[in-house]
Regions:
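C-terminal and inter-domain tail/linker signature
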Residues: 1-230
Length: 230
């Protein structure tokens, strides 16, 4: 790949390897060259700007969950060497809560949840990111209820951090709109129909033995769970 370290064979290989290098191999300093200095990272909890903010957040998470593992389930991508790439990395993350931190005093409990990181990359550098993690699933597996945890967190921090909203977004450099891949278009159509409450699409498009995972660590089998969770 033009502009990328030759040890990476393709974009999924790049995404998976640097994720492990940063998190599991403790290569936090590599964020200075893998992440752009002014990268915006958009999360439900707000907007973070700059690789230093990402380094600080990573340090805090590792202090709270030192045995955290990030297991790559899949990486899908679009783009090319000249225009740059967009990746979507679906992750299973496991950890044990052995340190004090954002999730309160150490509980000694473990969790397994999913996360998805969408990253725009060019020339060996990630310059724009969107990240969502199942925080509700973490909270529940640590023995708390999400609403109670959120209220306690607001009280501890002296007020709520404003959640991410397009009104306070900033330009990160990625201006494309994906592509016209037939499978992406099909998924977009399924999700649009579900969000429009056309749940007939689930039985029409999902296998009867489908396994679905939803926010809050709620996983289940077949059409009934998929319909109920939505």
């Amino acid at each position: 790949m033009k502009g990328f370290d030759p040890r990476f064979t393709d974009l999924p290989d790049y995404i998976i390897k640097i994720t492990r290098e940063i998190w599991e191999d403790r290569g936090l300093a590599t964020l200075h060259h893998y992440y752009a200095p002014d990268i915006p990272v958009r999360m439900p909890s707000g907007l973070s700007v700059g690789n230093r903010a990402t380094i600080d957040g990573t340090l805090a998470t590792l202090a709270e969950f030192p045995d955290r593992e990030i297991l790559a389930e899949d990486v899908i991508w679009s783009g090319d060497e000249d225009a740059g790439f967009l990746s979507s990395h679906r992750i299973v993350t496991t950890a044990t809560h052995t340190g004090n931190g954002v999730f309160g005093p150490a509980t000694g409990r473990s969790f397994t949840v999913r996360a998805i990181a969408d990253c725009a990359a060019k020339g060996n550098v990630i310059y724009d990111e969107w990240l969502i993690r199942d925080a509700g699933g973490i909270v529940r597996q640590l023995g708390m209820e999400p609403e109670t945890f959120a209220r306690d967190q607001i009280a501890r921090e002296g007020g709520a951090v404003r959640p991410f909203h397009p009104d306070h977004d900033i330009a990160g450099g990625y201006l494309s709109r994906g592509n016209d891949n037939e499978w992406g278009a099909r998924l977009a159509d399924i999700l649009t129909r579900i969000m429009d409450k056309d749940f007939t699409v689930i039985r029409a498009e999902y296998d009867r033995a489908v396994r679905t995972e939803h926010a809050g660590g709620q996983g289940g089998w077949s059409w009934g769970h998929a319909e109920t969770a939505w």
